[in-house]
Regions:
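Short, hydrophobic secondary-structure boundary micro-motifs
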Residues: 86-91, 114, 152-155, 201-205
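GST-like domain detector, emphasizing the conserved glutathione-binding G-site
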Residues: 1-133
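Residue-level recognition of oxygen-bearing side chains
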Residues: 73, 186, 199
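Residues that scaffold the ATP/ADP-binding catalytic core of kinase and kinase-like folds
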Residues: 77, 174, 203
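Charged/polar, low-hydrophobicity segments characteristic of intrinsically disordered regions
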Residues: 116-118, 193-212
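Acidic/histidine-enriched, glycine/proline-rich intrinsically disordered or flexible terminal extensions
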Residues: 207-225
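Phosphate/oxyanion-binding loops and surfaces in catalytic or ligand/nucleic-acid-binding neighborhoods
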Residues: 81-85, 174, 197
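GST-like fold's C-terminal all-alpha helical module
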Residues: 98, 102-196
Length: 225
């Protein structure tokens, strides 16, 4: 049976989230790298959403395809099959609901103001400073969560840590000089630890465009050239 494959964009935070989940679950998945201005017809035919990530799984005995086109669902699919780092904290199953609640707050509330903070020049109602302060409500909550532990749900990383990582990284990159002197030292340490991990380097590997050669590449491998 062929390996699953994922349509992915290198710097898309949702695709990044999905790739991190797949790598942490040690799932063998092939990557089809795309660009937003040249979406392959094959991808668009699979999901009405028309954006990455899209994971395609061949069902047993070739009985059709399973399509997963939400980044968190891709993480959960992979980790429910294999969770070698215990990101779901199976010993305390009630924590999963808390993780999902934190991720939902990130996705439903933080990301929308983060986008405005990143692209403040497109929004004429308020300044970048205004949107940054809107972001800081959630950022301060994360800082408070990290006061007693290195990760959001204890001494070890969880699903929530990896699901939020791409978006906290984006926040930190908007105005790095300001970010480095903010009163969020625990969150800075948290982000630094994640960015220094080998899995993050693998998740950010650049692959040739699938539309150029129609070749798939194994997630986690490196392409030289």
């Amino acid at each position: 049976m062929p390996l699953p494959y994922i349509y992915s964009l290198q710097h898309c935070p949702y695709a990044m989230r999905a790739r991190l989940g797949l790598l942490m679950a040690q799932q063998k998945v092939m990557v089809r790298a795309i660009t937003l201005n040249n979406k392959p017809a094959e991808m668009l035919a699979l999901s009405k959403k028309g954006t990455v990530p899209i994971l395609v799984i061949t069902n047993e005995e070739g009985a059709g395809l399973t399509i997963i086109d939400e980044s968190l669902d891709i993480m959960l699919w992979a980790l429910k099959i294999s969770d070698p780092h215990n990101l779901l904290h199976k010993d305390t199953p009630t924590e999963l609901d808390d993780m999902l609640a934190l991720i939902k707050k990130n996705d439903d509330e933080f990301i929308s103001v983060l986008e405005k903070y990143k692209h403040a020049s497109r929004y004429y109602d308020f300044s970048q400073l205004y949107y940054r302060r809107q972001c800081e409500g959630f950022i301060a909550q994360l800082e408070e969560t990290l006061q007693e532990n290195d990760y959001f749900f204890g001494a070890t990383a969880s699903l929530a840590d990896y699901a939020l990582l791409p978006f906290v990284r984006q926040f930190a990159r908007v105005d790095r000089k300001w970010y480095l002197q903010t009163p969020y030292p625990k969150l800075r340490d948290w982000l630094k630890r994640h960015l220094q991990q080998g899995v993050f380097t693998k998740a950010m590997a650049k692959f040739p465009m699938w539309t150029d050669n129609h070749e798939d590449y194994l997630l986690g491998s490196s392409i030289k050239g």
